[in-house]
């Protein structure tokens, strides 16, 4: 299934060509990741991204891109309608009529070939006798009900065909049934990718997350002696996982941990550094959930800063530049500028559009916290400007910040300032902090030398 690659990124992303009319649109077009994402997605998974682009780009080009994307699938009626729209015609060529008839005939054939085994798998008395041992299950079905390997394989073929027709719910069920019985490891792996895609396209996020784990396990075991194959498959998994990542809240922690794991952060740095945008957005917005486990969040933030710093020469956008400006360069003016640009990028990104407000809110908190740590007396007007707020909004923001974070500070409304009470750090504590830093740097150098 994963091998069902999309048409070239250039062909499809031509529908997202820049038509700049203002700075916001220029920023969105400059940092459009669609050409980067397409090669790592199945063509059916690309379709929602093109749909999202419909409101942003030349509608005719988007329709043409959809046609190029889907013309080799079995979604015959939809493809025919796209052809009519492109050619401004009410009639369609005979080839579409012929293909539709062929698809219907093939569906009928697959339904008949798989009828016996699908009926058996819907029989509770039969299912009750199935065990975790696939070989034993197949032997039981063969001896008791005359099931053959060919019948099992028909489930796989039928599931793939239903997927190509856009019947993703049916495809998920058929591929699941096939996977329960088949001992063909290659086909089982393909069926797992297919079921993963089907669950994504039916927005069945819990089921999709179950498939994430199954695909991950398959990559580790089936491709154990194939590092290049592992790299490619992990890259696919990372990209496909973006769908549940930002649509299913429980997936956020699981996938953030996965992306930061050594094998996957290495894959991101080696093969697809643009994924840092999504990892950064996840970590920043996780600040709003930091009460769950503050130490985990701080570790994620430190890891993110480290990777952004390392990969700055390879990839950057306003989201990663915001991290760099705030935590590497300590440039608050640049951080404010990049936050404004990041907001435009987020609003134009299919995966991140729903996180925009949460990102901006969390980013403002991070700017405030960093700014307050290094200043004793803070001008409210100045800080408001850095947060992109007017003075009244900034004053309310700072009041809420002091209340929510319980920092030791007071507001002098007459002077328009915030006075921070930074307790002096003991010499003992300073030595501990410096020792920690020296120890960490020693570990990094040792690891580098060991390589």
Curated annotation (Swiss-Prot):
HAMAP family: eIF3e. Belongs to the eIF-3 subunit E family. The keyword Cell membrane does not apply. Keywords: Cytoplasm, Initiation factor, Protein biosynthesis. SUPFAM superfamilies: Winged helix' DNA-binding domain. Component of the eukaryotic translation initiation factor 3 (eIF-3) complex. It comes from Aspergillus fumigatus (strain CBS 144.89 / FGSC A1163 / CEA10). Component of the eukaryotic translation initiation factor 3 (eIF-3) complex, which is involved in protein synthesis of a specialized repertoire of mRNAs and, together with other initiation factors, stimulates binding of mRNA and methionyl-tRNAi to the 40S ribosome. The eIF-3 complex specifically targets and initiates translation of a subset of mRNAs involved in cell proliferation. InterPro entries: eIF3e, eIF3e_N, PCI_dom, WH_DNA-bd_sf. The keyword Nucleus does not apply. It is found in: Cytoplasm. GO terms for molecular function: translation initiation factor activity. This is Eukaryotic translation initiation factor 3 subunit E. One of its GO terms (cellular component) is eukaryotic translation initiation factor 3 complex, eIF3e. Pfam families: eIF3_N, EIF3E_C, PCI. It comes from the Eukaryota. GO terms for biological process: formation of cytoplasmic translation initiation complex.
